[in-house]
Each structure stands twice: as structure tokens, then as C-alpha cells.
Amino acid sequence: ALLAENFYKTDNFIKAKKIYKIMSKQGEAFFWYSAKQNAKIFIQEGKKEKALKLITNTYEKLSEQNIYITFDYAKFLKNNEQFEDSIKLYTKIIKKIKKDHPLYPKAKDGRGVAYERIGEWEKAEKDLLSSLDASPDQAYVINYLAYSWIEKGVKIEQSLKMLEKANNLKSNDPYIIDSLGWALFKLKRYKDAKYYLQSAVELMPSDPIVNDHYGDVLWKNGNKIQARYYWSYVLNLEDAEEDLKNNIRNKLILGL
């Protein structure tokens, strides 16, 4: 398994697949693990439909679909935008376990994120809060919930305190640093916001949202030429969403 992992991490997918094929014949646990890793390779190769078909067929062939394998499957579906199907699986897990089970906060988080992605915010918020109630020190769950609140323009002071905690738990994480800076921006603490957003853009120089945020805070601090540079840069990033690009085009004309 370790050798296959090394091949996978170095993008040597042909050799990795050969090892996974051998492993798949060594019992159900290896059968599932091999399929999951092969599905990840298909995703890397841009074969999403093939990946989803493989992992779904494998899951359905298992004689025992235990909660850990079901969680793996749900997470894979969520990460590949099959949100409704992942919600069903997370719900299946949550119904089978108690609040003190180690999978409980993870399943609640996973389902909460999936709900948020399909626009079911009330259900998402409830699940994310429930996840943190069961396990309060999950930095990424704190970040997801707090950033969602900030984007909705609610509970910004509370979000800032939560993000300060998340930053203490996971120092130097660019996503958390960006969220922290964005909370300060929304509170009109522009100098403080610039400190964090500059750190975030240094850690994640190709992230569209981080660059957009940094452009905004530069503008508010009077650095308008630099702001336009960062906004323009986002327009050239392949993974920048069209809504973000349209918003930036407006800012390049009108400013903030």
C-alpha cells in the first residue's frame, strides 16, 4: 500500500494502478481501498464519470457496507459535487451512531457542507454547529461556518472571534488567514485586514478569491493602482468563476 501511495503521490498512475489491482484481490477492505484510490486517479486524469461509476459499483458490491466505508464513499461523492447523494449517506451514518462517536462530528460537517453547497443554509448551519458542539476544536469547520456567516453579512463579530481561535489551532493556514482578514475587512478595520490578506495572498498566490479580497483591501487602504493589478490578475486565472470575474470587471470600471 505504501509503495502504491508513493507512485500515486508522484503521479505515476500506471504503476499505482498495477499495485491497486493486486491489492484488490486481498479481501474486501483492500478491494474498497483499491477502488477508492483508482477513482482518485481517474479524477486526476479528468475522468470524473468513470471515477464515480467505479466507486459506486464497488460500494454496491460490498457484502458489508460499514460506517467507515460509507463515510469514505460519502466524502468522495461530496468532494466531486454529488451533494444530494452524499447527504443521504451522511444521514445514514448519523442515524447509526451516537454523538460521542468519532465519526459523528465529521459526518455532521460533511453533511453540513453538502447542504450549504445546494443552498440549504438552515440545515447546513444546524449541522455545522452540531459538529462543533461535539468537537469544538475543528479549525476547518470553524472556518467554514464563520466564513459563511461573513459572506451572509451576519454574526461578523462572533465570526472574527471564532476565526482567531481557528488561526491559533492551525497557524499559517492560508484559508483561515484569508477568512480572518475578510472578517476584519467587513468590520472596516482595513489596516488590520490588509496584514492578514497580504499573508494569505503570499501563501496562496494563485487563488482567485484571495487575490480578489486582497485587491479590495488595497483599494480601501488607498492603494488603487495595486488593487487594480490584483483584480486584473484574477481575470487571467483559469479556475476563477464567471460570477467573480464579472464582479471584478465592474470594480475595474467603478472601483469600490
Regions found by a protein language model. Name each.
Residues 5, 40, 75, 113, ...:
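Residue-level recognition of tetratricopeptide repeat
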Residues 33-34, 69, 103, 107, ...:
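TPR alpha-solenoid repeat register
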Residues 9, 44, 79, 110-113, ...:
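Register position in tetratricopeptide repeats
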Residues 28-29, 63-64, 98, 102, ...:
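Short coil turns that delineate tetratricopeptide repeat
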Residues 213, 220-256:
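Terminal, low-structured helical/coil segments at or just beyond the last alpha-helical repeat
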